[in-house]
Amino acid sequence: MMSKPIVEARGLHKHFGHLHVLKGVDLEVAERELVFVIGPSGSGKSTLLRCLNRLEEPSAGSVVVDGIDMLDPRTDINHARQRIGMVFQSFNLYPHMTALGNVTLALRKVAGKSRAEADALGMTALQRVGLADRAGHTPGQLSGGQQQRVAIARAIALEPRVMLFDEPTSALDPELVGSVLEVMRDLRRSGMTMIVVSHEMGFARNAADRVLFMDHGLVVEQGPPNAIFENPSQERTRAFIGQIQRH
């Protein structure tokens, strides 16, 4: 029996014009749970994440994160988003700022920390991702893997209750993926609640509590990793897993 969910979405729909991208998705995630979302391109995985923190406005449905109704017009969305860290495929770092500057910007502008407080918290976050010695480097002086670790540090510095990862390794050279996954494993060990959209199936098998398979805007099937990867019940899931295992 799942404890009271920290993330709860009900009946999520999202339209982009005539395109119906999410078709009534329900999602519950318990505190400290790591949920992996897999599926073909265009299945709605990234849109689901972006609807959870209202980077995209759902067309219908409800989203509650850590007790906050994310779709209530009275909700201070910037304050609410401090509880939801998000890491993107494309890093989204400011190129003219140092690694530390990128991490501390939101601490000062959103969380209202003094520069000294922000710098201390920022250095702690960079240390957690193994980049304290790169604090003074700009993104152009860092590898793609290091840039993504700075992006993770930026998110965790705000001490979120939930972390969303949208294909965090898909823009990286293969040899750089491991360092990012190791940081995610460390977050997992620390008890962070995480929802991950990724093609890193090995990581999903080894680290996830639960795997959701999405297709055409719907959750087709969900279950423990061994059930989804070894014995899926739905034909569409079997076809997808078979295809990725052949490559």
Residue ranges and their predicted role:
Residues 1-3:
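The identity of the second residue at the extreme N-terminus of proteins
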Residues 5-225:
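ABC family nucleotide-binding domain
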Residues 222, 226-247:
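C-terminal boundary and immediately downstream tail of ABC-type ATPase nucleotide-binding domains
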